Every structure is written in structure tokens, then in C-alpha cells.
């Protein structure tokens, strides 16, 4: 919106031409989302508390978590509102990728909102059934995947890029692309949701990864940089850096309220949406394998749940004291802050390793 206004008046005020730079708008998007979240956050927390939109805590979980019962949840709505407003303000609204990412993010956010609403307002601990949740996640992911593959103009837009190797790409075809896109979006969405079990645990890795994806998006959308770094050039993908900047800014502000001891939880409305956002951006800029590296904490948390369930069903024994993995370490004696910060450190190292793929080819 502001970009269009700047372009309209650029002939009279040449200084406005600076808004054509994606890098500047990415920084401004991050700052805008940060400020919106900081301003709106306290009021939202007061409203959630007044309406008793509180988190239920599982009885079989770590006993230290019982004090969290009643903490306001559904705070992820704050993140989504900040991202949406900021993206509409600073991104190029004629760019189709901007709308694809926004629609996907808000679509998954709506699924999470219904789930949270049923849990909190209707006092239904199960919320939206797993089958219904997966159905709607699948519907959105498949529709988005079909749109992307059927409107692709370049082979690079539908190939699997292998990082750390020059010009190594695997053609996926329509079926392969749709399948991979489905698993990346739905998988990342649910992985972030599973990880969101401790104060600040999920949001900081999300901020780190979205910041890295902003760099990948900018490079992918820049023909010269993409060629120099051996990355596929995806026309118009650079504009996603603005969205990623907004996500990082909103997420960082949310961490202010979500840090231990948390004043608010993001709930499924935030976790499912943010995971889907990371997933769809990853797909568009063709960095699925790099995302697997950078999101290593999310991957391991998800695998811990899968292994725990499989082990118990097959041999009647549990591999971990409790799943997801962060609860296992809590029961081993780690303090909540220790688990969170150590997982942050691991994510930071993985993100830096993922970013190194830009040059190490």
C-alpha cells in the first residue's frame, strides 16, 4: 500500500524512490510489526485475562507446569494481526507470492483459532478433532501446491534444490511437487505446534528461521545475486523478504510477553500459522532441504513424538520419559529456561549452517 503511494508521488518527491528497495521495506516491516505488537500486546493480554481465555495444563505433564494453568492463550492472534497489517503496508500488493503466503498463513491461523476457541470457550479439551484439523490443513496445502505448480513459468520453480552442491537439482514433476509442498507446509505447521510447549521455546527459533528465509528470499528474487551464489532465480520471490521481516518483528515482540514466566501463550492460532508461513516461504524459494537443517529442533521434537507413539504401540515401552523431547529433558532435571535457551542455541547454529549454503557450493 505504502509502496504504491510512494511510486505515485515519486515523480514529485524523488526521495520516495528509496521505498522501492526491498531491503529498506524489510527493515521497516520488522520495525512496524514490532511496534504494533508492543502497543497492542498489553491490551490484548488484559482482554484475554478478563474473558478467562486461559490455557489448560495436562495433569500428566511436568508438575512445574501446573502453575501455568489459566495463563491467557490465543496470543498468536496478535502476531498474525501485526504480520497482516505490516505486510499490507510495506509489501508490493501486486506480487502474487505475497498474497499466497498471506492467505496460507491466515488460513492455518483460522484452523488454529477454531481449535483454541473450542478448547477454551466450549471447555472441550480435544478442541478441533485431529481428523478435521488435518483435513483443512491438507485442503489449503494441496490447493496452494497446485496453484504454484500449475502457474510455474521456470523449471527452477518446481525442482528440489540440493544445497552445498553446484547446480544439483531434482525435477519433481506435478505429483512430486504437490507431495513435497504438502509435507513441507503441513509438517512444518504441526512441528512448530508440537514445539510450542515451553515459554518462548517455539517463537525464537521461528524468528531466527524467518530472518534467514528473508535472506534466501531476497537472493532468490535478485537475478544477479542468485546467479553468483548458484541459487535458482525465482522472479518476484524477493518481496517475501518483507513478509519474513514482518514475521520476525512480530515474533520478537511476542517473545517479550511469552518469555518465562509467560504472560501469554500463542496457542494453536499462532503455532499452526507460523509453521505454515515458514513452510510456504520455504517452498517458494526452493529451500526445502535447507529448511530441514535450520528447523532441526522442530524436526527432532516431531520425531520424538512419532517414535514415542510407535514404540509404545509396538513393544509397550516408551523411549523418552515424555514427548515431545523438551518434556523429556525437564523430567531429567533441566530447568525450563535451560531447555529453552539450549534449544535456541542449537537453532542458531543450525540457521547459520543453513545460511552457509549460500556460499558453500
UniProtKB/Swiss-Prot annotation:
<keyword id="KW-0131">Cell cycle</keyword>
<keyword id="KW-0472">Membrane</keyword>
<feature type="transmembrane region" description="Helical">
    <location>
        <begin position="97"/>
        <end position="117"/>
    </location>
</feature>
<comment type="similarity">
    <text>Belongs to the glycosyltransferase 4 family. MraY subfamily.</text>
</comment>
<feature type="transmembrane region" description="Helical">
    <location>
        <begin position="73"/>
        <end position="93"/>
    </location>
</feature>
<keyword id="KW-0808">Transferase</keyword>
<dbReference type="GO" id="GO:0008360">
    <property type="term" value="P:regulation of cell shape"/>
</dbReference>
<keyword id="KW-1133">Transmembrane helix</keyword>
<dbReference type="Pfam" id="PF10555">
    <property type="entry name" value="MraY_sig1"/>
</dbReference>
<dbReference type="GO" id="GO:0051301">
    <property type="term" value="P:cell division"/>
</dbReference>
<feature type="transmembrane region" description="Helical">
    <location>
        <begin position="25"/>
        <end position="45"/>
    </location>
</feature>
<comment type="pathway">
    <text>Cell wall biogenesis; peptidoglycan biosynthesis.</text>
</comment>
<keyword id="KW-0961">Cell wall biogenesis/degradation</keyword>
<keyword id="KW-0460">Magnesium</keyword>
<dbReference type="GO" id="GO:0051992">
    <property type="term" value="F:UDP-N-acetylmuramoyl-L-alanyl-D-glutamyl-meso-2,6-diaminopimelyl-D-alanyl-D-alanine:undecaprenyl-phosphate transferase activity"/>
</dbReference>
<dbReference type="GO" id="GO:0046872">
    <property type="term" value="F:metal ion binding"/>
</dbReference>
<comment type="function">
    <text>Catalyzes the initial step of the lipid cycle reactions in the biosynthesis of the cell wall peptidoglycan: transfers peptidoglycan precursor phospho-MurNAc-pentapeptide from UDP-MurNAc-pentapeptide onto the lipid carrier undecaprenyl phosphate, yielding undecaprenyl-pyrophosphoryl-MurNAc-pentapeptide, known as lipid I.</text>
</comment>
<dbReference type="InterPro" id="IPR003524">
    <property type="entry name" value="PNAcMuramoyl-5peptid_Trfase"/>
</dbReference>
<feature type="transmembrane region" description="Helical">
    <location>
        <begin position="134"/>
        <end position="154"/>
    </location>
</feature>
<feature type="transmembrane region" description="Helical">
    <location>
        <begin position="289"/>
        <end position="309"/>
    </location>
</feature>
<feature type="transmembrane region" description="Helical">
    <location>
        <begin position="264"/>
        <end position="284"/>
    </location>
</feature>
<dbReference type="Pfam" id="PF00953">
    <property type="entry name" value="Glycos_transf_4"/>
</dbReference>
<feature type="transmembrane region" description="Helical">
    <location>
        <begin position="168"/>
        <end position="188"/>
    </location>
</feature>
<dbReference type="InterPro" id="IPR000715">
    <property type="entry name" value="Glycosyl_transferase_4"/>
</dbReference>
<keyword id="KW-0132">Cell division</keyword>
<feature type="transmembrane region" description="Helical">
    <location>
        <begin position="237"/>
        <end position="257"/>
    </location>
</feature>
<keyword id="KW-0573">Peptidoglycan synthesis</keyword>
<keyword id="KW-0812">Transmembrane</keyword>
<feature type="transmembrane region" description="Helical">
    <location>
        <begin position="338"/>
        <end position="358"/>
    </location>
</feature>
<dbReference type="GO" id="GO:0008963">
    <property type="term" value="F:phospho-N-acetylmuramoyl-pentapeptide-transferase activity"/>
</dbReference>
<keyword id="KW-0479">Metal-binding</keyword>
<keyword id="KW-0997">Cell inner membrane</keyword>
<dbReference type="GO" id="GO:0009252">
    <property type="term" value="P:peptidoglycan biosynthetic process"/>
</dbReference>
<protein>
    <recommendedName>
        <fullName>Phospho-N-acetylmuramoyl-pentapeptide-transferase</fullName>
        <ecNumber>2.7.8.13</ecNumber>
    </recommendedName>
</protein>
<dbReference type="GO" id="GO:0071555">
    <property type="term" value="P:cell wall organization"/>
</dbReference>
<keyword id="KW-0133">Cell shape</keyword>
<feature type="transmembrane region" description="Helical">
    <location>
        <begin position="200"/>
        <end position="220"/>
    </location>
</feature>
<dbReference type="GO" id="GO:0005886">
    <property type="term" value="C:plasma membrane"/>
</dbReference>
<dbReference type="InterPro" id="IPR018480">
    <property type="entry name" value="PNAcMuramoyl-5peptid_Trfase_CS"/>
</dbReference>
<keyword id="KW-1003">Cell membrane</keyword>
Amino acid at each position: 500500500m505504502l509502496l504504491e503511494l510512494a511510486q505515485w508521488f515519486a515523480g514529485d518527491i524523488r526521495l520516495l524512490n528509496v521505498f522501492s528497495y526491498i531491503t529498506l521495506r524489510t527493515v521497516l516491516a520488522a520495525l512496524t510489526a514490532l511496534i504494533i505488537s508492543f502497543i497492542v500486546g498489553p491490551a490484548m493480554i488484559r482482554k484475554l485475562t478478563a474473558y478467562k481465555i486461559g490455557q489448560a495444563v495436562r495433569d500428566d505433564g511436568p508438575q512445574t507446569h501446573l502453575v501455568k494453568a489459566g495463563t491467557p492463550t490465543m496470543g498468536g492472534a496478535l502476531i498474525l494481526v501485526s504480520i497482516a497489517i505490516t505486510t499490507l503496508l510495506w509489501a508490493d500488493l501486486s506480487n502474487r507470492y505475497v498474497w499466497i503466503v498471506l492467505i496460507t498463513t491466515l488460513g492455518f491461523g483460522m484452523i488454529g483459532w477454531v481449535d483454541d476457541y473450542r478448547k477454551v470457550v466450549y471447555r472441550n479439551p480435544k478442541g478441533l478433532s485431529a481428523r478435521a484439523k488435518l483435513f483443512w490443513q491438507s485442503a489449503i496445502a494441496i490447493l496452494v501446491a497446485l496453484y504454484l505448480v500449475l502457474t510455474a513459468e521456470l523449471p527452477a520453480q518446481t525442482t528440489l534444490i540440493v544445497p552445498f552442491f553446484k547446480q544439483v537439482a531434482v525435477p519433481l514433476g506435478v505429483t512430486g511437487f504437490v507431495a513435497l509442498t504438502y509435507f513441507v507446509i503441513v509438517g512444518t505447521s504441526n512441528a512448530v505446534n508440537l514445539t510450542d510447549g515451553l515459554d518462548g521455546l517455539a517463537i525464537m527459533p521461528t524468528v531466527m528461521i524467518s530472518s534467514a528465509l528473508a535472506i534466501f528470499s531476497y537472493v532468490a528474487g535478485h537475478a544477479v545475486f542468485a546467479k553468483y551464489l548458484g541459487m535458482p532465480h525465482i522472479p518476484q520471490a524477493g518481496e517475501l523478504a518483507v513478509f519474513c521481516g514482518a514475521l520476525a518483528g512480530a515474533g520478537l515482540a511476542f517473545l517479550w510477553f511469552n518469555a518465562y514466566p509467560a504472560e501469554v501463550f500463542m496457542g494453536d492460532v499462532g503455532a499452526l500459522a507460523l509453521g505454515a508461513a515458514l513452510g510456504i516461504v520455504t517452498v517458494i524459494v526452493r529451500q526445502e532441504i535447507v529448511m530441514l537443517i535450520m528447523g532441526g529442533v522442530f524436526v527432532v521434537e516431531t520425531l520424538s513424538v512419532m517414535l514415542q507413539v510407535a514404540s509404545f504401540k509396538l513393544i509397550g515401552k516408551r523411549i523418552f520419559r515424555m514427548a515431545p523431547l523438551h518434556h523429556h529433558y525437564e523430567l531429567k532435571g533441566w530447568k525450563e529456561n535451560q531447555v529453552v535457551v539450549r534449544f535456541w542455541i542449537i537453532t542458531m547454529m543450525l540457521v547459520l549452517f543453513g545460511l552457509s549454503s549460500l556460499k558453500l557450493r
